[in-house]
Amino acid sequence: FTQAGPGSVPEVSRPEFCNDCGHCLLVCPVGAIRHRNLEGRAITEVEKDLLPSFRQVQEMVRARRSIRNFLDKPVEREMIEKVVDAARFAPSAKNTQSTRFIAVDNGETLRRIASMTAAWLGRSAKKLRNPLVRAVYLMRGLTTKEEYSRWIGQFELTARNMEKGIDTILYRAPALVLFHADRRVRFAEANANLALQNATFAA
């Protein structure tokens, strides 16, 4: 926005740069801005009284853990929807909102996902033992020798565990939310990781 002088009406100077983030609508102190692409769409106002203090945010960040011990009971659909809703408010580069979500709570489907993933890791470990594949990875700087060896060991162990009925993929979680995006979108992976962090804190 630009303003020619005191008392004059501000004007949008470069509309082609607008990415429809809606921030201008939120920061206007008198709600005077109308956006042609956001008419009729919900703009969520921030309830400042509910915002946590820095100390509370700091403690939440410090307390965050990767939990791999799940209760053997279903997760309510409403709870899953709340977690996904929190995820979708994550920022994204150029407001592309590229992240999409797939929620799975069917036990049989979850077991198939874990089993197929473990099988893929087992096949990958065999490929990684090929000296030519190893040379390409190291030559292109995709990993280090130590990490490469660790990959093989971890992949093979995961595959063996699954054959024994030990799930070290999903750890028999009752629900799963997959974050995905079109790989052609710039920063799609970073956008998905930001959404994942939101979901993690919400969960």
What are these regions (language model features)?
Residues 1-203:
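Acidic, surface-exposed loops and disordered segments
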